[in-house]
């Protein structure tokens, strides 16, 4: 059976891990990094690049670079590049393809199965979108698991004692808090809460807004109108945020950020940690409510928590750590890597599903209540939040009007009392109900939530036995046909990328061969046959002429001709050198005088020790 990889598909960075020898290990990417920026870019030549290389060129190519796509998962948002629209699922699939390729290169085998993590507070449509992204990337997604739960697996797999832990997960774009009970290989989530629109990206934005404001006040320039300048600000803000985790002050120096009629504009700002904390104070404060909510839902006090795990790069910010200390009254546990533990946990879950890891049971919960709209626009909950999944719940409803033959089931997710204030997951109709006074027909609505947290709903008329069932696909979801089309496009893109890589490698080999030919001619021109020299010159010229043609077969053909010409010349030169050396050796031996007589002689070994 092929390996099951664990993927943390993050807002700003992603990570992939696998079980090796009973341990979860992080797989480094092709560039040698342990995490991969969740950045996709399209060059003007149509080449698609992902990861560190894409992030590096973002300043010069801001219009064709996509960042933080995870924030748009489960929505109708589209990215438009070169008159082609891409869904968040497709962009995410490109990141997953890169992680898959890096894993295959590391393992030396094909990878087809994965466990992918999502924020605990992701809605059904966001989870479904993540699963679709995996399919488009050519992966069978065995399980979607929550990021805090994955982190707890990475932390607690080798811990024997029973304990209650709180996972505070603040990443690039999302915030989650989960409370779990660990013991005897059982990881049971007691409560979860969060905010899907809060993370390190928002911290960066606050620094950017601050810098834009300074530039406007001091130079009268609005940088928001210049995409390239904003991309430079984004990179500088992220760098400053990271530096302020270890230093109390940092310098942001951006020369030639813009220009005015009076000349170029240079931005040179000293940002202190105190000022940074002032800029983000209200954002960090937004994590307090969900943390207290999770404690209340679990029926626990801060003193009942044995360990606090910090997950996600944004938890390195000192103000965040100080806030956690204030809420929970204890020092957070620093024993896990906040950037890697989620992927490691996903790999462990992959090991559980593949049968590699024994005696581990993961019991997760649904983060939001599920229900339907009933008379008067009321939201009637069928499954309360923090219910352990997988789960199933049914309830009997009736018609709202006399002789009603059709019932529309409006499925929602959320915590508000009125249907309009909650998130619509989908709608479907149960038809063919026999005419009857209102309140007489009995309609059973059944909810199923699978282990991935994905919802399935059915409605049945108990009088006629008629049933209608759907797996929720929200208005932002993809149809099976769309997914299949995207899978084919992704495969075609992967093939195009492979060919492009092959072209580059062939070109590099050709450049190297031309250089080798020039060195050989320089070294042996005086000793070689002129015909052989001419043949190399001709073959070299022909290879140089086809180099820009992008015709790989033609380039290889001309490389072969040049290689052959070089081989012929060097063989002859070395043979010639060998023959000359042999002739000189013979001459030296023949030059010694001999008298023609041969003498026989006896010899005796003398032992010096016995000499007298």
UniProtKB/Swiss-Prot annotation:
SUPFAM superfamilies: Actin-like ATPase domain, Heat shock protein 70kD (HSP70), C-terminal subdomain, Heat shock protein 70kD (HSP70), peptide-binding domain
Annotated segments matching region Disordered: 578-612
Keywords of this entry: ATP-binding, Chaperone, Nucleotide-binding, Phosphoprotein, Stress response
InterPro entries according to UniProt: ATPase_NBD (IPR043129), Chaperone_DnaK (IPR012725), Heat_shock_70_CS (IPR018181), HSP70_C_sf (IPR029048), HSP70_peptide-bd_sf (IPR029047), Hsp_70_fam (IPR013126)
PROSITE patterns: HSP70_1 (PS00297), HSP70_2 (PS00329), HSP70_3 (PS01036)
Triggers of expression: By stress conditions e.g. heat shock.
Molecular function (Gene Ontology), one example: unfolded protein binding
Amino acid composition bias (Basic and acidic residues), ranges on this chain: 601-612
Phosphothreonine: residues bearing it: 174
Family recorded in the similarity comment: Belongs to the heat shock protein 70 family.
Function of the molecule: Acts as a chaperone.
Listed HAMAP family: DnaK
Protein name: Chaperone protein DnaK
């Amino acid at each position: 059976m092929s390996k099951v990889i664990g993927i943390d598909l993050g807002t700003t960075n992603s990570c992939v891990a696998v079980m090796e020898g009973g341990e979860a290990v992080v797989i480094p990417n092709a560039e040698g990094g342990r995490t991969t920026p969740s950045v996709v870019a399209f060059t003007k030549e149509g080449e698609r690049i992902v990861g560190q290389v894409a992030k590096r060129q973002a300043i010069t190519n801001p219009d064709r670079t996509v960042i933080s796509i995870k924030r748009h998962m489960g929505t109708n948002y589209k990215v438009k590049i070169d008159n082609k629209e891409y869904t968040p699922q497709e962009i995410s699939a490109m990141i997953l393809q890169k992680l898959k390729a890096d894993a295959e290169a590391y393992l030396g085998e094909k990878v087809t199965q994965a466990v992918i993590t999502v924020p605990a507070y992701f809605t059904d449509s966001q989870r479904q979108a993540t699963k679709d992204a995996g399919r488009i990337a050519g992966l069978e997604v065995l399980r979607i698991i929550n990021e805090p739960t994955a982190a707890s697996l990475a932390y607690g797999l080798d811990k024997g004692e029973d304990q209650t832990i709180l996972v505070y997960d603040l990443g690039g774009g999302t915030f989650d808090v989960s409370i779990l009970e660990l013991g005897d290989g059982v990881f049971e989530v007691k409560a979860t809460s969060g905010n899907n629109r809060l993370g390190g990206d928002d911290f960066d934005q606050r620094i950017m807004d601050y810098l834009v404001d300074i530039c406007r006040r001091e130079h009268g320039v609005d940088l928001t109108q210049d995409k390239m300048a904003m991309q430079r600000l984004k990179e500088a803000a992220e760098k400053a945020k990271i530096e302020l985790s270890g230093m109390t002050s940092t310098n942001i120096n951006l020369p030639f950020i813009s220009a005015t009629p009076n000349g170029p504009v240079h931005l040179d700002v000293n940002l202190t940690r105190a000022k940074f904390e002032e800029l983000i104070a209200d954002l960090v404060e937004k994590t307090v409510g969900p943390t207290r909510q999770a404690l209340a839902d679990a029926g626990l006090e801060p003193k009942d928590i044995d360990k606090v795990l910090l997950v996600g790069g944004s938890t390195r910010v000192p103000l965040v750590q100080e806030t956690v200390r204030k809420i929970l009254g204890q020092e957070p546990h620093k024993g896990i890597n906040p950037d890697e533990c989620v992927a490691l946990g996903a790999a462990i879950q992959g090991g559980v599903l593949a049968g590699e890891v024994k005696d581990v049971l993961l019991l997760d919960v649904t983060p939001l209540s599920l229900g339907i709209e009933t008379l008067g626009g009321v939201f009637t909950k069928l499954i309360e939040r923090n219910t352990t999944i997988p789960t199933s719940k049914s309830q009997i409803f009736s018609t709202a009007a006399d002789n009603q033959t059709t019932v529309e089931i409006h499925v929602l997710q959320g915590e508000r009392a009125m249907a309009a204030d909650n998130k619509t997951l989908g709608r479907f109709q149960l038809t063919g109900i026999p005419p009857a006074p209102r309140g007489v027909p009995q309609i059973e609505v059944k909810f199923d939530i699978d282990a991935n947290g994905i919802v399935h709903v059915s409605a049945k008329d108990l009088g006629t036995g008629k049933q209608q069932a759907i797996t929720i696909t929200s208005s932002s979801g993809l149809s099976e046909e769309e997914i299949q089309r995207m899978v084919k496009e992704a495969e075609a893109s992967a093939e195009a990328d492979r060919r492009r890589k092959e072209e580059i490698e062939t070109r590099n080999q050709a450049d190297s061969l031309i250089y080798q030919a020039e060195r050989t001619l320089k070294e042996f021109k005086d000793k070689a046959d002129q015909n052989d020299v001419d043949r190399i010159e001709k073959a070299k010229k022909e290879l140089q002429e086809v180099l820009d043609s992008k015709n790989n077969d033609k380039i290889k053909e001309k490389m072969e001709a040049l290689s052959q010409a070089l081989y012929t010349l060097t063989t002859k030169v070395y043979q010639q050198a060998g023959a000359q050396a042999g002739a000189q050796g013979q001459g030296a031996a023949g030059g010694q005088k001999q008298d023609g007589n041969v003498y026989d002689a006896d010899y005796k070994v003398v032992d010096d020790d016995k000499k007298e």
